[in-house]
Structure formats: structure tokens, C-alpha cells
């Protein structure tokens, strides 16, 4: 989360499920909806989750104090849910839908912050 704050990232893309076939694939690094979690000196609040067919879009508020500067960010996480562990998705339609939603946000934000994948 410190990297997100330091780089002022406003988009995170996640292509894996946390669990698949009973096996952990990725750590869940965000809180439940309307909850706040602390990660070191960074506080993350899950403000909203919107479930689209094939992916979830989350709005996360991130706050931290770095070198006596308070930083507050609002970012979007795009979590793709249709990518199987093996082999590849049967269709690209859900991934393309998520990509279009992400690109729209990038175009509207007019920032040059990096996208975290």
C-alpha cells in the first residue's frame, strides 16, 4: 500500500481469484464493503463494490501520513473473476468489458499515475 500512496496510483487491476479449487492464489489486500483495514501506516476503506458480469469494480479510499504529509487517495480496483487457473478463459468478452471500463476511467482521470497489475 505504501507504493500505491507514494506513486499516487488510482487504478489497480487484479486478474486472479483469491481462491480456486480450494487453493489460495492471491492474498486479499482490501477490506469488506463499508469496512476499513489498516496495513502498517496506511488505512484502506472499501467504499463501494459494483458487480459486473465477469468482474468486480471496487472504490477504495486510501489514507496515510508520509513524512508529516497527510495523503488521501480514491482509487478503483478492477478484479477480474473469469480467469481460470488452468488453462485460459473460454471467451475474451468479460476481459474486454473490464478493459473498456478501465480505459474509460484512465481517459477521464487525465493523470499519469501508474496502473498496478
Swiss-Prot record:
Annotated InterPro entries: Prot-tyrosine_phosphatase-like (IPR029021), Protein-Tyr_Phosphatase (IPR050348), PTP_cat (IPR000242)
Gene3D superfamilies: Protein tyrosine phosphatase superfamily
Annotated Tyrosine-protein phosphatase domain residues: 1-117
Keywords: Hydrolase, Protein phosphatase
Binding-site list for substrate: 85
Record's catalysed reaction(s): O-phospho-L-tyrosyl-[protein] + H2O = L-tyrosyl-[protein] + phosphate
EC number: 3.1.3.48
GO molecular function: protein tyrosine phosphatase activity
Family: Belongs to the protein-tyrosine phosphatase family.
Annotated protein name in UniProt: Tyrosine-protein phosphatase 26
Species the sequence originates in: Styela plicata
Upper lineage: Eukaryota, Metazoa, Chordata, Tunicata, Ascidiacea
Amino acid at each position: 500500500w505504501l507504493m500505491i500512496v507514494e506513486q499516487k496510483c488510482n487504478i489497480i487491476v487484479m486478474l486472479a481469484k483469491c481462491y480456486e479449487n480450494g487453493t489460495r492464489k492471491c492474498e486479499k489486500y482490501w477490506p469488506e464493503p463499508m469496512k476499513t483495514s489498516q496495513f502498517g501506516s496506511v488505512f484502506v476503506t472499501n467504499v463501494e463494490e459494483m458487480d459486473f458480469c465477469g468482474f468486480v469494480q471496487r472504490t477504495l479510499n486510501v489514507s496515510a501520513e508520509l513524512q508529516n504529509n497527510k495523503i488521501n487517495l480514491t482509487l478503483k480496483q478492477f478484479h477480474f473473476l473469469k480467469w481460470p487457473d488452468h488453462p485460459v478463459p473460454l471467451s475474451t468478452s468479460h476481459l474486454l468489458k473490464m478493459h473498456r471500463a478501465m480505459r474509460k476511467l484512465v481517459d477521464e482521470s487525465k493523470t499519469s499515475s501508474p496502473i498496478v497489475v
